Amino acid sequence: VGAGGVEESLKKFFRAKAWALLHDPPHKMWVLYGTLKLTAGGHREDAVKVWEELGLREALGDPADSEEIVHAADDMASTSDRWITNFAFANVVRVFEYNKLHNIFDPKHQIDIRPLRRDELDEFLRDLAGELKPFAGDPRRVYHALYALYEVEWAARKLPPSLADTRAPTHTLFDHVYATALTLNLLWPDGKVGGYAVMVDIPGIQQVVGAARKAGDFWAGSWMISAVTWLTLWPFVWEFGADVLLKPSPRYNPYYHATLWAQLGGDHRLWSRFRELYSSLLPRPVGGMFEPQHAVRQPVIPGTACLVLPRVRPDGRELGRQQLEREVRERFEKACELLLALASGEQVSEEPYAAFFKLLSEKEGAQKPSARAVVKLFKIIKDAEPRAFEGLLRARVAVL
């Protein structure tokens, strides 16, 4: 594929994913009620208007080019709901108005959804457009920024979430559109079901944690598992988009937000949106001081992960099953190698890992845990638990 072809393939790929996120506008519920509209049409016309307001027509092109495959992903991401509700409401011709969000596991727990005001929507779109603008020249960067900021901006402002379907009030519009973006990977590039589910599992986790206890460093063992897992996943997340990450979810994920923030250049205005989100979720004073270098020091990534990947790369190259399994194993080995390099005091400048390691290398003070504790931990595991050490360096990988 020539340079021009690669550029067009990238734009086509990330245009489809961005349209998957925006095919239903964030205020869809109120469009259907007729109380808040950006156009004289329905919610599809408003979705196109949102696309334009965010500057994505200039950055990614016409969303109509992605309509067919996104429509298929939309159906697949919400099939069970639509089967049930379309049957139950078959004779209902008017819009079913409902303004409560219920806990899917215990529907007795519910919250009221207040009406969204026009000025709130306008301000949200204006500010989000300003945050996306610096990345408009790069399809991958603008999509990552959209994916990371879209829900975060809404939540940080404490705006009311639209229900995805008022007839099934157990999930929000954000739940649906983010699921649609993930589902698109199974249909890319021709709408036919395919793609891969990739399971990654780090063996010997209990031995690693046990060795950390023996070393008197409870943090190091858990953090090492988190860091190895994340560094195995990050190259795929950066190349294909965060929507490929099924477990752990990239939504409300401080590792993803911090690593992406550094990868996109480390703009402090950008991090302020994430800080606002976490300050509302974390107890004070932790939330108010939550910085990107804090995020990547928390051992919150599990030792088991799942990716959902398309059978064709963003640049148009085919991705075979055996090739993918080999790449995952190589990324895991690279993650272990780079962590040892960091712990030995070496600088890591290799892409796309450099941003993560730059965050780790920032000074935090003596009271903060240091990544160099990994050296001591590796030695203890190797001496006391040789089988665990050998297993740690050989992840279990399954590609389905």
Give the label of every model feature segment.
Residues 1-400:
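Regulatory and interdomain segments flanking nucleotide-handling catalytic cores
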